[in-house]
A protein has these predicted regions:
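Internal maturation/activation junctions in enzymes
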Residues: 129, 140-182, 186
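Amphipathic, small/basic residue-rich leader segments at the start of a protein or domain
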Residues: 1-123, 147
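A short core secondary-structure module
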Residues: 189-220
Length: 220
């Protein structure tokens, strides 16, 4: 398939709807100047059209393969993901203290919009990683942030969200998985997870060195 990015429309939406110019007036997002924003929006459009869109059909025809417990992606996916990471697209809005660029999340949304329009199945990989980064940045302990964020932000590791259960699909509120705090012993302060999760998007693949699974569970 071919993909033609709607760069000018996206720039208009980012300026008018997302208020990027107002964000850039703050100290936190001062780097989000017009020239940089245009370079990001134009650059990711070209990248999505040139590297991810052509793999849409490849993914349909070849598909992923599971052999001896190892999931292998079709030809071209590993190189495209490596280029995505090398060019810094995964780190656009990642916290600067963990190797990210610290830019407004609006720009990460634009990256994901372009990648998703070009190849939605492939785009779910970075989308889930960005979600894991956001969750850990806002809710993770300092220890968890130090352990996981640098490699998630760099793209060396990827992330997932473990929500779906046999009886809880779109009705996430029906989940039964529980998390019980361990109070004693060598694992004190951690949680014992009990339950079953299924249909974990990008739950196994060969593109990242490690996959971090965020599990949704109920506390007692």
């Amino acid at each position: 398939m071919t993909y033609t990015p709607a760069t000018q429309d996206q720039l208009l939406a980012i300026r008018v709807n997302a208020g990027i110019e107002e964000l850039a007036q703050s100290e936190k997002f001062a780097a989000a100047e017009p020239d940089l924003v245009e370079a990001i929006v134009g650059g990711i459009g070209e990248f999505a059209a040139g590297e991810w869109a052509p793999l849409n059909r490849v993914g349909d025809l070849e598909g992923a393969k599971l052999e001896n417990g190892v999931v292998t992606l079709p030809d071209g996916f590993a190189a495209a993901y490596e280029h995505y990471v090398e060019q810094g697209w995964n780190a656009i809005s990642g916290p600067a203290e963990f190797g990210g660029q610290g830019l407004p999340f609006t720009l990460s949304c634009n990256v994901l919009e372009n990648l998703g329009t070009a190849n939605m199945a492939f785009n779910l990989l970075p989308m889930l990683s960005v979600g894991a980064i956001e969750s850990l940045e806002h809710h993770g302990s300092p220890e968890l942030q130090q352990k996981y964020l640098p490699k998630l932000v760099s793209g060396e590791w990827s992330g997932t969200m473990n929500l779906t259960e046999p009886q809880a699909g779109s009705d996430v509120g029906a989940l039964r998985t529980t998390a019980h705090l361990i109070e004693d012993g060598e694992h004190a302060g951690k949680y014992r997870i009990k339950g079953q999760k299924i249909y974990i998007t990008w739950g196994e693949h060969d593109l990242a060195k490690n996959i971090i699974h965020l599990v949704l569970a109920r506390l007692p």
